[in-house]
Amino acid sequence: MVTAASEMELFLPKSYDIFWSLVILIIVAVFFYKFFLPKFQAVFDERAAKIEGGIAKAEQAQKDADEAKAKYDAQLSNARVEASKIRDDARAEASHIIADARTRAEADAAQITATAQRSIESQQQQALVSLKGEVGVLATALAGKILGSKLESDDVQSTMIDQMIAELDSDKK
């Protein structure tokens, strides 16, 4: 058993080794606690603040993006309404322009028709006057041949022409 006890002592350190190891461990722990731990804590706090700030910025950016999207949607809706209104106004104005053009065209057509009608009536009057004059000359010549003499008096010619025209008008009616 002596050998077993000596083998166990090989694995267990001596008490002074344990004591000085504990003293060094406490010194190193105090050194870490006083110098390194505050620096690490400051770095960790700074990093946590950055992360929290980044999260807050991201949330604010998301909120701003949502507001911008809502504003954009409202503007888009307003633009669509405005475009619809402009399109309807343009259609109404086009209808009004077409109606005005149609009215002017009808008025112009009526004016042209009236002018043409007056021109036709004027030409008809001129043709009738010209025809009466030629018929009168022909009638006088014919009457002169029939009567065997020439009708020389203007009054007689005029009376005869008027009678023939009156007869033609009465036959016409």
From Swiss-Prot:
Classify the source by domain of life: Bacteria
Q: Which InterPro entries does the record match to this protein?
A: ATP_synth_B-like_membr_sf, ATP_synth_b/b'su_bac/chlpt, ATP_synth_F0_bsu_bac, ATP_synthase_B_chain
Q: How does it sit in the membrane?
A: Single-pass membrane protein
Extract the Pfam families matched here.
ATP-synt_B
Give the main location.
membrane
**TM annotation in the entry:** 18-38
Q: Which GO terms describe its molecular function?
A: proton-transporting ATP synthase activity, rotational mechanism; proton-transporting ATPase activity, rotational mechanism
Which CDD domains does the UniProt entry name for this protein?
ATP-synt_Fo_b
Q: Is Ion transport one of the keywords UniProt gives this record?
A: yes
List UniProt keywords, sorted A-Z. Answer: ATP synthesis, Cell membrane, CF(0), Hydrogen ion transport, Ion transport, Membrane, Transmembrane, Transmembrane helix, Transport
The Gene Ontology CC terms held by the record are:
plasma membrane; proton-transporting ATP synthase complex
List, alphabetically, the Gene3D superfamilies matched: F1F0 ATP synthase subunit B, membrane domain (1.20.5.620)
- Coiled-coil positions: none
> Where can this protein be found?
Cell membrane
Function field: F(1)F(0) ATP synthase produces ATP from ADP in the presence of a proton or sodium gradient. F-type ATPases consist of two structural domains, F(1) containing the extramembraneous catalytic core and F(0) containing the membrane proton channel, linked together by a central stalk and a peripheral stalk. During catalysis, ATP synthesis in the catalytic domain of F(1) is coupled via a rotary mechanism of the central stalk subunits to proton translocation.
For this chain, the family text in UniProt reads:
Belongs to the ATPase B chain family.
Q: Quote the NCBIfam families the UniProt record gives.
A: ATP_synt_b (TIGR01144), PRK05759.1-3 (NF004412)
Assembly and binders:
F-type ATPases have 2 components, F(1) - the catalytic core - and F(0) - the membrane proton channel. F(1) has five subunits: alpha(3), beta(3), gamma(1), delta(1), epsilon(1). F(0) has three main subunits: a(1), b(2) and c(10-14). The alpha and beta chains form an alternating ring which encloses part of the gamma chain. F(1) is attached to F(0) by a central stalk formed by the gamma and epsilon chains, while a peripheral stalk is formed by the delta and b chains.
Its protein name is ATP synthase subunit b
